[in-house]
Amino acid sequence: MNNDFLVLKNITKSFGKATVIDNLDLVIKRGTMVTLLGPSGCGKTTVLRLVAGLENPTSGQIFIDGEDVTKSSIQNRDICIVFQSYALFPHMSIGDNVGYGLRMQGVSNEERKQRVKEALELVDLAGFADRFVDQISGGQQQRVALARALVLKPKVLILDEPLSNLDANLRRSMREKIRELQQRLGITSLYVTHDQTEAFAVSDEVIVMNKGTIMQKARQKIFIYDRILYSLRNFMGESTICDGNLNQGTVSIGDYRFPLHNAADFSVADGACLVGVRPEAIRLTATGETSQRCQIKSAVYMGNHWEIVANWNGKDVLINANPDQFDPDATKAFIHFTEQGIFLLNKE
């Protein structure tokens, strides 16, 4: 059995003179969840539409389970999509919404009723079949949309920013539910989001896209710290990028020096480099060396941490500080870097 289940080969998509997907290759293994992550306009939604058959590639091929589906319609690809907007029918009951696709396939009433019951149980909505859309919450509506896709037992499940309309607590619980169901059912899945936390929470692999190409692939969160791309720094967590120097495992930014024990992981030669610092990698103290002194410009309490902007070494630095580790009345402090959350880049 071939484990390369969903394959995009040399895919290019142009609209007029504008190329939005440029010679893209992508392989999704059987039974895995892969997320396309990137800012608006990076091409991730176009890839989704190409896989689903909603758009045709300008060139290249798409294979599902070894079959060339490049020219196949969406009806012939055995794919289901969970949309951001849920797209539920308000005049139908929950059971009829979930069973709509089965009815279109001509599945008998008895089998349809049983499969709808099983699908609703999967998403913890047993007993909801007779309710209507306006009688359930947003999180429950999203689970109905998920059940409607799962009931068809598709070869490929596509999820298009499915959690963006939910509040923070619902997003957390729903991404856990989506991941649990995907692993339990073994459905090959393609997930699209611009939220990096969401991406890593649900995925076997994360694909970062920018300007129609794959910039990087990662299976672990270390990706965010160790191999983040300079061109995506603002999107990927507001890291601060500083001019620095590397010398045998010691990093210098101006007069501030600190050891970086995993410096060899970054494939950056000794000498001038770029040093990326994540907001959570910075600790503020009341004392320190002159080279670490910073001026507090602003501090906003975000509910579970302080988001601080400090001027240090001539640059505004974004810092996330725990409530018990920061004095909101402070006007100055001293910066300390922790190794986890520091990454190095070659100067272009």
From Swiss-Prot:
It is a peripheral membrane protein. Its EC number is 7.2.2.7. SMART domains: AAA (SM00382). Keywords: ATP-binding, Cell inner membrane, Cell membrane, Ion transport, Iron, Iron transport, Membrane, Nucleotide-binding, Translocase, Transport. PROSITE patterns: ABC_TRANSPORTER_1 (PS00211), ABC_TRANSPORTER_2 (PS50893), FBPC (PS51242). Part of the ABC transporter complex FbpABC involved in Fe(3+) ions import. Responsible for energy coupling to the transport system. Its main location: membrane. ATP binds at residues 38-45. Belongs to the ABC transporter superfamily. Fe(3+) ion importer (TC 3.A.1.10) family. Residues 6-236 form the ABC transporter domain. This is Fe(3+) ions import ATP-binding protein FbpC. It is found in: Cell inner membrane. InterPro entries: AAA+_ATPase, ABC_SmlMolc_Importer, ABC_transporter-like_ATP-bd, ABC_transporter-like_CS, ABC_transpr_FbpC, Mo/tungstate-bd_C_term_dom, P-loop_NTPase, Transp-assoc_OB_typ2. GO terms for cellular component: ATP-binding cassette (ABC) transporter complex. It comes from the Bacteria. Pfam families: ABC_tran, TOBE_2. The keyword Iron applies. The complex is composed of two ATP-binding proteins (FbpC), two transmembrane proteins (FbpB) and a solute-binding protein (FbpA). It catalyses: Fe(3+)(out) + ATP + H2O = Fe(3+)(in) + ADP + phosphate + H(+). Disulfide bonds: none annotated. GO terms for molecular function: ABC-type ferric iron transporter activity; ATP binding; ATP hydrolysis activity.
